[in-house]
Amino acid sequence: MTTTLSSNWKKLSSKLNQGSKVTKQPVKGKNGKTKIKKAELENTLNITPTLQKSTLSPIELALWTKENDINVSDIAVQTEKITLIPQGNDIRKKEPGKYLAMDCEFVGVGPEGTESALARVSIVNFYGHTVFDKFVKPRERVTDWRTWVSGVTPKHMNEAISFQEAQNETSKLLEGRILVGHAIHHDLDALFLSHPKSRIRDTSQYKPFRSISMGKTPSLKKLSSHFLKIDIQGSAHSSVEDARATMLLFRLHRKEFEQSIRTQNRKPEKTS
């Protein structure tokens, strides 16, 4: 069965393609001589005009379309990295802001590497921009790097920070903000941090998300596939990608999420 692009996606592609077309019609000057347009001259001299492009992963693409009011269903056919011209460079959208999504990666310690130790902390803002991403030196000897699933290797320890630094920096970032995560208590426990329950948005506990797993805790991979039509964690995990996927899931259901939180926090009225 052939997958067809939606009309919105076709319009977007058409608009992007129009931006790359160059008109080569000659222009007559006042003296009747033909002028060579700048774009044509640059092509003749093999000069490439400065044009910043960025390669977006499926998650980055989904965040980009959400930011630009394009339906997620319009990008469902995108399974590989593609190149898009970024829309603007709003510095405010790169600041931490009100909402932060966090995800961590772990390595194995202890006999046979069965116990877990923190090895990476990644935090992204509401728009998916990375505001913190550091590898962390485990406090115990690593017996299993779990690279196939964690993406962490011994080389990453050359640029890693101490556990104390990771804990302090994360704590400062999260203070006063709403924390979004998937089974976020695992990440908080690993950092020995706590966060007000009223300021936590956990995608693993959201009822509409749990409905696809018969009320059980769904995996982030399953949620991304079902609701975003995006395949994540294809090989090794990336805590940045996982944090972005979690934030995007929250953004798609933010109004309902916030309403459910208000309902949970609403105290029952006292009866006389």
Curated annotation (Swiss-Prot):
InterPro entries per UniProt: Exonuclease_RNaseT/DNA_pol3 (IPR013520), REX4_DEDDh_dom (IPR037431), REXO1/3/4-like (IPR047021), RNaseH-like_sf (IPR012337), RNaseH_sf (IPR036397)
Gene3D superfamilies referenced in this protein's UniProt entry, alphabetically: Ribonuclease H-like superfamily/Ribonuclease H
Transmembrane segments: none
Chain segments carrying region Disordered: 1-33
GO molecular function: 3'-5' exonuclease activity; nucleic acid binding
Alphabetically ordered keywords of this record: Exonuclease, Hydrolase, Nuclease, Nucleus, rRNA processing
Superkingdom as given in the UniProt entry: Eukaryota
Chain intervals with Low complexity compositional bias: 1-17
GO biological process, one term: rRNA processing
Places the protein is found: Nucleus
Keyword Calcium among record annotations: no
Pfam family membership, one: RNase_T
Main location: nucleus
EC number: 3.1.-.-
One Gene Ontology term, aspect cellular component: nucleus
Domain Exonuclease: start-end pairs: 99-250
Similarity field: Belongs to the REXO4 family.
Record's function text: Exoribonuclease involved in ribosome biosynthesis. Involved in the processing of ITS1, the internal transcribed spacer localized between the 18S and 5.8S rRNAs.
Protein name, as recorded: RNA exonuclease 4
Organism encoding this protein: Debaryomyces hansenii (strain ATCC 36239 / CBS 767 / BCRC 21394 / JCM 1990 / NBRC 0083 / IGC 2968) (Yeast)
